[in-house]
UniProtKB/Swiss-Prot annotation:
The keyword Secreted applies. InterPro entries: Thionin, Thionin-like_sf. Gene3D superfamilies: Thionin-like. The keyword Secreted applies. Its main location: secreted. Thionins are small plant proteins which are toxic to animal cells. They seem to exert their toxic effect at the level of the cell membrane. Their precise function is not known. This is Probable thionin-2.3. It comes from Arabidopsis thaliana (Mouse-ear cress). Disulfide bonds join C28-C65, C29-C57, C41-C51.
Length: 135
């Protein structure tokens, strides 16, 4: 019984540590156009590491962007809430569908990805205007 408790404790600690590392990750880009390219790639449901490589952006865990990569986030506006909500929603909920997209020849997965992306857009824009107005 003690062995199971130790294994369970190590598993929980590993999950907590990996969650902290994921939350601390920041993507920094050399220009606004590469930042936009990165965001478009993510909104299509691709993995963050793939989008960083394709757009020329860098993932960092230090909390700030290195020199030459000053664009770590969008400018502060009401649209930022929507953009980041959509990016997070699409990448977490629609990512698995996107990887299936390449294997599907019938087009059914394309429809599912479109619906998933639209659902994320609806969820994210529904209450964001109220939240931005109250801040």
């Amino acid at each position: 019984m003690e062995g199971k408790t130790v294994i369970f404790s190590v598993l929980v600690m590993g999950l907590v540590i990996s969650q902290i590392q994921v939350e601390a990750q920041k993507t920094c880009c050399p220009s606004q156009s590469t930042r936009k390219e990165f965001e478009d790639c993510i909104s299509e449901g691709n993995l963050q590491i793939l989008c960083s490589a394709e757009s020329g952006c860098r993932d960092t865990y230090v909390g700030y962007c290195p020199s030459g990569f000053p664009y770590g986030s969008l400018t502060n506006s009401g649209d930022v809430v929507n953009v980041y909500c959509k990016l997070g929603c699409v990448s977490s909920l629609c990512g698995a569908l996107t990887s299936l997209q390449k294997l599907d020849t019938s087009g059914k997965v394309n429809v599912a990805v479109e619906r998933c992306t639209k659902a994320c857009s609806t969820i994210c824009t529904k209450g964001s205007k109220t939240a931005v107005e109250t801040v």
